[in-house]
């Protein structure tokens, strides 16, 4: 009889342990899914070290790894924690970088220009073309639902001044050298340049 009671207690303990294991796994799986959604909802225009596609792929891989795991081990929990903390760092980052972005001319034709950019966390990017002609922001214009990021050039004068001031204060010391290199690269794509006329 004592053996029967002992075995019954063990079965009960195993059921409780299994329920706890499943609840922990479900919670981590849910959190990994939320993290993936947060990354997908962030700005795709980022400096190379915060590559959007690589971050989405890493979060997707982690979510799938958690889903296929039988239990949550410390290594899996550490992997989630490091990814979560990295995304928190990106969300508060203001980083200066250069990018070749689509802009529109007076005839509403789209073409690409090099621009200096300032990342405002993972929700927007300020930009100014290196020739200084176009100033604007890249942000989510969707009121609700899936994110829809667009380049906005039609900013008012006050916002334009604020964007230029933010970009100017974020410039690194070697800013002028990088701009000179990008201006040379821009000549390759300029249809009015001698290089394009020759070819």
Predicted features, each with a name:
Residues 98-100, 104-199:
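Long mid-to-C-terminal scaffolding/interaction modules that assemble large complexes
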Residues 1-88:
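Charged heptad-repeat coiled-coil "stalk" segments of single-pass membrane proteins
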Residues 6, 20-21, 49, 54-58, ...:
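Arginine residue identity/basic-tract feature
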Residues 24, 31, 94-97, 142-143:
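General N-terminal targeting signals
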């Amino acid at each position: 009889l004592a053996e029967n009671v002992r075995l019954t207690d063990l079965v009960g303990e195993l059921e409780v342990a299994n329920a706890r294991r499943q609840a922990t796994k479900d919670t981590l799986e849910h959190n990994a899914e939320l993290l993936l959604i947060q990354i997908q909802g962030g700005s795709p225009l980022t400096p190379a070290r915060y590559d959007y596609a690589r971050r989405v792929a890493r979060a997707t891989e982690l979510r799938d790894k958690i889903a296929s795991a039988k239990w949550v081990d410390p290594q899996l929990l550490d992997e989630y924690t490091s990814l979560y903390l990295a995304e928190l760092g990106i969300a508060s980052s203001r980083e200066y970088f250069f990018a070749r972005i689509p802009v529109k001319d007076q005839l509403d034709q789209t073409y690409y220009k090099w621009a200096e950019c300032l990342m405002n966390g993972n929700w927007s990017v300020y930009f100014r073309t290196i020739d200084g002609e176009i100033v604007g922001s890249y942000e989510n214009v969707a009121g609700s639902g899936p994110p829809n990021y667009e380049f906005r050039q039609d900013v008012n004068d006050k916002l334009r001044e604020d964007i230029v001031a933010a970009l100017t204060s974020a410039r690194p010391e070697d800013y002028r050298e990088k701009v000179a290199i990008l201006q040379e690269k821009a000549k390759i794509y300029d249809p009015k340049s001698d290089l394009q006329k020759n070819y």
